[in-house]
Amino acid sequence: MSKKSQLVFAMVAGELSGDILGAGLMAALQKSHPDARFVGIGGPRMEALGFESLFAMEELAVMGIVEVLSRLPRLLKVRASLIKDITALKPDCFIGIDAPDFNIGLELKLKARGIKTVHYVSPSVWAWRPKRIFKIAKATHMVLSLLPFEKAFYDKHQVPCTFVGHTLADDIPLRSDKAAARQLLELDADAEYLAILPGSRGGELKQLAEPFVKAALLIKENFPDIRFVTPLVNQKRRDQFEQALKDHAPDLEIHMVEGKSREVMTAADGILLASGTATLEAMLVKRPMVVAYRVSPLTYRIAKSMMQVNRFSLPNLLAGKDVVPELIQDDCTPEKIAAAVTVELNRDFAPLNAEFERLHQMLRCDASQKAADAVMRLVETKEG
């Protein structure tokens, strides 16, 4: 460990889900080291705990291979600046939270400069581009994985990895309170609601807002009394979604909420959502869901050629079988989405609810504390 009396941690979180994980890790580290300093790139939750952001987190919130290329010069400039600043800071440890295409390159440079590095959230090496594990081994002293099957993959390749579970599984109660969520959001206690979550990034809304809005029109035909509620992460995303609504379904009423995505999902009877961490939250609040995703055709062709698995949503990956419908790319049409949502809203939910509860228990491990303990073991380990 550094001889400094104050521990210093450099961290980079790339998006909303990383901010949640980063804040949980910070809080756990602050319990035993209240004067620890945290510097790098973080979001509002991390900043509320005293995190010092050198750049806005939005800089890294880019989706898709093609989409990243247009932002590459700026991303490289940010990374070069971080390498310089973090090297000068000489932190006790660097923790890259998710954002693997950005963070692993950063970790590689920092590790070569003698800084201990941790990657929090395993990249999906088991799903696509499995050879990345060799770069991860070179770039990190340890990986913190959220999902149990990931550790087995790292163990097989003799790469240090600690399974910590998922903070969402710790935070979300085993029994979610629909009535309380509706009261909080001022929604009708007795109406049937479908939550629509088209993603938190601009690129996601660009791809998904139109088919989701058009699907809602078709769903309304099957369920005339159904109501729709959509959480948007900020005003920019709200403006984007409102434009899609105006363009494609001007007469459709959708109740919009800023933030509060978990409360919206809890309040709903069913959920239509983009693939990503939100699918895990939907599973943990135990609601029937339809998962859809679409990227640019070129991004999809490149990604498909590298895929090692046939599933992409977290509930299905965790279960090791198809428990929720997935509609990707050409299947992400209003007609197919509406048909899938109709089936899910009409089905017997009891077997799926039991499966979701089993998966919830599996991920409930006090993740932030386990992650903090693993980081501190590394910090206290002497080099060589």
Swiss-Prot record:
It comes from the Bacteria. GO terms for molecular function: lipid-A-disaccharide synthase activity; phospholipid binding. GO terms for biological process: lipid A biosynthetic process. Its EC number is 2.4.1.182. Keywords: Glycosyltransferase, Lipid A biosynthesis, Lipid biosynthesis, Lipid metabolism, Transferase. GO terms for cellular component: membrane. Pathway: Bacterial outer membrane biogenesis; LPS lipid A biosynthesis. Pfam families: LpxB (PF02684). It is an enzyme of class 2 (transferase). It catalyses: a lipid X + a UDP-2-N,3-O-bis[(3R)-3-hydroxyacyl]-alpha-D-glucosamine = a lipid A disaccharide + UDP + H(+). Belongs to the LpxB family. Condensation of UDP-2,3-diacylglucosamine and 2,3-diacylglucosamine-1-phosphate to form lipid A disaccharide, a precursor of lipid A, a phosphorylated glycolipid that anchors the lipopolysaccharide to the outer membrane of the cell. HAMAP family: LpxB. This is Lipid-A-disaccharide synthase. It comes from Shewanella sp. (strain W3-18-1). The lineage of its organism: Bacteria, Pseudomonadati, Pseudomonadota, Gammaproteobacteria, Alteromonadales.
